[in-house]
Amino acid sequence: MADAPRVRAYVGLGANVGDPHRTLQAAVSALAALPGARLRGVSRLYATRPVGVTDQPGFMNAVVAVDVPAGPDPDSGALALLLALKGLEAAFGRQARRRWGPRELDLDLLVFGRHRLHVERPTSGRSDDL
């Protein structure tokens, strides 16, 4: 049986609460364990200064390339991944804080194949609201 169609996605990871290095390592493993996911690459870790709210510890960041099921259409495939990312953030204990504030784990869907994501959901314009 042939594999279902897949899409290459790039996910940004960041953390600055607790042990960010260990958190990002565990998050990469959790991303690889998502149903149907195939990890394709992981960048090195980058130490970055906070933006916006600067009175907080610096961040550790990375980017992961992962092939995921495309879904019946690009919108549903991207939304499924976005919701999975938000679920992982919650599982890692992410707390609701001010914009650009500290993060136990921040996962951002940077690229989903060649698709531009259009989400039909009320938001305030921030990815944190999904």
How does the language model describe each region?
Residues A15, V64-A70, V111-R114:
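Short beta-strand-to-loop capping motifs
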Residues V66-L83:
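Short helix/loop segment flanking the catalytic signature motif in cyclic-nucleotide metabolism enzymes
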Residues G12, R40-G41, Y46, T54, ...:
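Residue-level signal for pocket-adjacent positions within structured domains
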Residues V51-F59, L79-L130:
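Flexible, gly/pro- and Lys/Arg-enriched active-site loops
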Residues A2-A37, S43-A47:
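N-terminal beta1-alpha1 ligand-phosphate binding loop
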Residues G41-G71:
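Short, charge-patterned binding micro-sites
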